[in-house]
């Protein structure tokens, strides 16, 4: 039986809770060291939908194949996203005041709830990143990966066979310069 923690990615599973927590803590330490030295951080938001644990209302990062009945799925509001990100951003800048953050919205389509809900989710993320950029001018920037793929590269050759993910050709257009 594999042990896992609901607030972690599924790759952090182990035969015992102690071993699982050891892997998680080791990775947290490495990530913390990296972020203290980084000059830039790119954050890509994929969807405004989250899963909340019914027992306590907590948002979980991974359902770990637990029964669906244990969770409520909801789309966060723009304000909820902004308010959730502010403490994290302030904590990052407390550790690394020079850190510049670049937000993007993933062009990968989430069709689970249909095209309309996907667009509402992406619009929510776009409004949230815009609000954060306005709240922290000079510290947060936005790269329009979503807009480039949806508007400039809307030809189907820029999509993979599943018509949801970008094709390898589109990545050449979406890659940031390395300066």
Predicted regions and their residues:
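Conserved small/polar residues in nucleotide/adenosyl-binding loops
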Residues: 1-7, 172-178
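Short amphipathic alpha-helices and their capping/turn segments at secondary-structure boundaries
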Residues: 24-42, 87-94
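Short, solvent-exposed beta-strand-terminating loops
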Residues: 45-56
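A solvent-exposed, charged loop/short amphipathic helix patch at secondary-structure junctions
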Residues: 55-78
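Extracellular serine-dependent O-acyl
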Residues: 100-102, 123-155
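Histidine-centered active-site loop/cap adjacent to the catalytic His
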Residues: 160-174
């Amino acid at each position: 039986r594999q042990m896992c923690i609901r607030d972690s990615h599924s790759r952090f599973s182990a035969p015992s809770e102690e071993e699982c927590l050891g892997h998680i803590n080791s990775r947290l330490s490495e990530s913390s060291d990296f972020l203290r030295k980084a000059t830039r951080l790119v954050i890509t938001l994929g969807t405004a939908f989250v899963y909340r644990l019914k027992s306590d209302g907590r948002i979980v990062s991974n359902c770990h194949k637990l029964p669906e009945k244990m969770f409520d799925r909801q789309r966060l509001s723009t304000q909820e996203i902004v308010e959730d990100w502010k403490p994290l951003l302030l904590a990052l800048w407390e550790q690394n005041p020079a850190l510049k953050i670049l937000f993007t919205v993933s062009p990968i389509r989430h069709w689970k709830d249909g095209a309309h809900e996907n667009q509402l989710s992406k619009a929510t993320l776009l409004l949230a990143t815009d609000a954060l950029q306005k709240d922290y001018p000079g510290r947060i920037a936005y790269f329009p990966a979503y807009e480039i793929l949806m508007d400039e590269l809307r030809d189907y050759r820029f999509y993979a066979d599943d018509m949801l993910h970008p094709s390898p050709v589109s990545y050449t257009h979406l890659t940031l310069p390395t300066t």
